[in-house]
UniProtKB/Swiss-Prot annotation:
The lineage of its organism: Bacteria, Pseudomonadati, Thermodesulfobacteriota, Desulfovibrionia, Desulfovibrionales. This is D-alanine--D-alanine ligase. Its EC number is 6.3.2.4. Pfam families: Dala_Dala_lig_C. ATP binds at residues 127-180. The gene is ddl. It comes from Nitratidesulfovibrio vulgaris (strain ATCC 29579 / DSM 644 / CCUG 34227 / NCIMB 8303 / VKM B-1760 / Hildenborough) (Desulfovibrio vulgaris). It comes from the Bacteria. InterPro entries: ATP-grasp (IPR011761), ATP_grasp_subdomain_1 (IPR013815), D-Ala_lig_Van_CS (IPR000291), D_ala_D_ala (IPR005905), Dala_Dala_lig_C (IPR011095), PreATP-grasp_dom_sf (IPR016185). Binds 2 magnesium or manganese ions per subunit.
């Protein structure tokens, strides 16, 4: 097939997108596909025309215009199939303040939060206690994520977010271990337990620096806990109207309470990223995972 590989974009996660796309291109070529790159930052105006002349689009964008559903809407207009969720599910999952309301309404635990659409007054306090996390409301890769332990650290953390993003979300730090779990088709994958370097948390540096974190797959958790993580992951995937694949990130507290932090509709796709690790645990190497995502995308488009 003629595959349009969409990567780059204009978000702060551009470099992550391009790095992952190189591995995807290699896998697509190994599968026998003819690959053409398209970078929305260069010419978003040309996407409809490019998509119309290709059999499939593989999206590897992080942040806007991929995770917010814009590219998916344009591909739908062009009649070009693609992997993953459609415009509505993509937008809903990317917006943490909105998706958290939906998840909580349906009984899924998520940390309390304060949402900010603009810089607050200098003396503003979220009333969530310390430590807490400050992060963009619509963003990934843990960019601009700050852990704040004292009130005097709140204003600089918020400024770091608003320097790059229009909205912020503040959450209390939940003590526990970090767990992530992917969905492929209608199946929850084996969860991963993440152990950041001592004294750190799973921020951008930990994610993309060798040795920044230890990722244990499958997670060394009791069978009933693993089953619970997978069940909640599938529920969240369906509640948000997602399809194809996704990845949910959690904090698992010592008492067994599982707090869903966010759901990613275009999770990292380097061969060593989290979802590819989970797929490998069930016998799917990276090219096989890419092939499965294409198959799911074609099926969703009725092809």
């Amino acid at each position: 097939m003629k595959v349009l590989l969409i990567a780059g974009g204009w978000s702060s996660e551009r470099d992550v997108s391009l790095a992952g796309a190189r591995g995807i291109e290699k896998a697509l070529c190994a599968l026998g596909h003819d690959v053409t790159w398209f970078d929305p930052a260069t010419s978003l105006d040309g996407l409809l025309e490019a998509a119309s002349s290709h059999d499939f689009a593989f999206i590897n964008l992080h942040g806007s215009p991929g995770e917010d559903g814009l590219v998916q809407a344009m591909l739908d207009t062009a009649g070009c199939p693609y992997q993953g969720s459609g415009p509505a599910g993509s937008f809903l999952a990317l917006n943490k303040a909105v998706s958290k309301q939906l998840l909580r309404r349906h009984g899924i635990l998520t940390p309390d939060w304060a949402f900010l659409a603009a810089r607050p007054a200098a003396d503003w306090e979220p009333g969530l206690g310390y430590p807490l996390f400050v992060k963009p409301n619509t963003g990934g890769s843990s960019l601009c994520l700050s852990r704040v332990t004292q009130p005097e650290g709140l204003a600089p953390a918020l400024e770091a977010v608003f320097a790059h993003c229009g909205e912020a979300i503040v959450e209390p730090a939940i003590p526990g271990v970090e767990v992530t779990c992917g969905v492929l088709g209608d199946t929850a994958l084996p969860p991963i337990l993440i152990r950041p370097a001592e004294g750190a948390f799973f921020d951008y540096t930990s994610k993309y620096t060798p040795g920044g974190a230890t990722e244990l797959c499958p997670a060394p958790l009791p069978a009933e806990v693993t089953a619970h993580v997978q069940d909640v992951t599938l529920r969240a995937h369906r509640l948000l109207g997602l399809r194809g694949y996704s990845r949910a990130d959690y904090i698992l507290r010592d008492d067994g309470a599982l707090f869903l932090l966010e759901v990613n509709t275009l999770p990292g796709m380097t061969p060593t990223s989290l979802v590819p690790q989970e797929a490998a645990a069930i016998g799917l190497d990276f090219p096989a995972l890419i092939a499965r995502l294409i198959e799911l995308g074609m099926t969703a488009a009725g092809r």
